[in-house]
């Protein structure tokens, strides 16, 4: 009986720990505003400050947003997911919510007041959404609407993707399709002839290593903001070429 009680207590403690962790990672609703850009097909949202390039081919689609400076956090927020709902405006709001991925920066415009055109100026939290995403919660003619937002887990198909660009002694790895928190905080790389080496964030979710790794199979460790790490061992074969994409593990 004592053993069973101890097991139940341990299970309950683990559940409470996970609940606290989830609450810390994905907080309560907060207030912001949202606008839209990129056109009806979202073609104007391609590229962006996170480095994801063609958002169709990298799997992000049209449910994306550019974040204001305070949310973007120098690129550390790239890949994070947010649930947004239009906030209590019967004329301009639509019911329901939409989940978007952070793929770009909405730059500040200090020539305009924060509440009249300088929507993305610090310290305002603001989402400049891809037009198709905005139209799921707001009316086109509104232009800008008040929203409530919260961080939510990212849901992805398949594993984390590593696209190797650059050249010898300058390996630039784009990390995409990250589930869970989505926002990569650190990356390490290991060649078949080297130990683990930390990479530095070059820009967005492009991570840089200056080691010579040509001809080696490659492994990656990816850490996200909730403290978890995924290791993808030998995910890149020795015969890799620059420009190729490889799929590893997932959160």
Swiss-Prot record:
Domain Expansin-like EG45: 47-159
UniProt entry tagged with the keyword Manganese: no
InterPro entries: Expan_Lol_pI (IPR007118), Expansin (IPR002963), Expansin/allergen_DPBB_dom (IPR007112), Expansin_CBD (IPR007117), Expansin_CBD_sf (IPR036749), RlpA-like_DPBB (IPR009009), RlpA-like_sf (IPR036908)
Keywords: Cell wall, Cell wall biogenesis/degradation, Disulfide bond, Membrane, Secreted, Signal
Residue intervals passing through the bilayer: none
GO terms for cellular component: extracellular region; membrane
Top-rank lineage group of the source organism: Eukaryota
Identification of the protein by name: Expansin-A2
Cysteine-cysteine disulfides: 50-78, 81-154, 86-93
Pfam family, one: Expansin_C
Residues making up the signal peptide according to the UniProt record: 1-24
Expression induction or repression: By gibberellin (GA3), submergence and wounding.
Tissue specificity annotation: Expressed in lateral root primordia, adventitious root primordia, coleoptiles, shoot apex, leaf primordia, panicles and flowers.
SUPFAM superfamilies per record: Barwin-like endoglucanases (SSF50685), PHL pollen allergen (SSF49590)
Record membrane topology: Peripheral membrane protein
GO biological process: plant-type cell wall loosening
Location in the cell: Secreted, Cell wall; Membrane
Functional description taken from the UniProt entry: May cause loosening and extension of plant cell walls by disrupting non-covalent bonding between cellulose microfibrils and matrix glucans. No enzymatic activity has been found. May be required for rapid internodal elongation in deepwater rice during submergence.
SMART domains: DPBB_1
Name of the encoding gene: EXPA2
Keyword Cytoplasm tagged: no
